[in-house]
Amino acid sequence: MGQNPKRLLKRAEFLAVRRGEKRRGRFFLVEVLDRGDGGVPRVGYTVTKKVGNAVVRNRVRRRLKEAVRVHAADDMVPGNDYVIVGRDDALRAPFGQLKAELSRRFRGTR
């Protein structure tokens, strides 16, 4: 089992990851930036107001965080930063499908 990723917390960290690779999925967009230091992967979550009100956005964020925690963290590459931009489909997707999609995007496969 891999180590748990750290969190991206500062706006500057989120903006830096935007310069990296974008991996589009049905339930979310994953932005990836290789820091080049081989350290613990870091992850940040964001859900835009387009998805819904605060309750809906928080539910989407919680589902994504749990999917990363229980399953997809093992597929994160050390030294990478990830920003997961949630979409409203992430709320209705079966949890197993959400986990599998996250793992695929972290590995960089379609």
UniProtKB/Swiss-Prot annotation:
Its EC number is 3.1.26.5. It holds the Pfam family Ribonuclease_P. GO terms for biological process: tRNA 5'-leader removal. Keywords: Endonuclease, Hydrolase, Nuclease, RNA-binding, tRNA processing. Signal peptide: none annotated. RNaseP catalyzes the removal of the 5'-leader sequence from pre-tRNA to produce the mature 5'-terminus. It can also cleave other RNA substrates such as 4.5S RNA. The protein component plays an auxiliary but essential role in vivo by binding to the 5'-leader sequence and broadening the substrate specificity of the ribozyme. The keyword Glycosyltransferase does not apply. The gene is rnpA. This is Ribonuclease P protein component. Belongs to the RnpA family. InterPro entries: Ribosomal_Su5_D2-typ_SF (IPR020568), Ribsml_uS5_D2-typ_fold_subgr (IPR014721), RNase_P (IPR000100), RNase_P_CS (IPR020539). It catalyses: Endonucleolytic cleavage of RNA, removing 5'-extranucleotides from tRNA precursor. GO terms for cellular component: ribonuclease P complex. It comes from the Bacteria. The keyword Ribosomal protein does not apply.
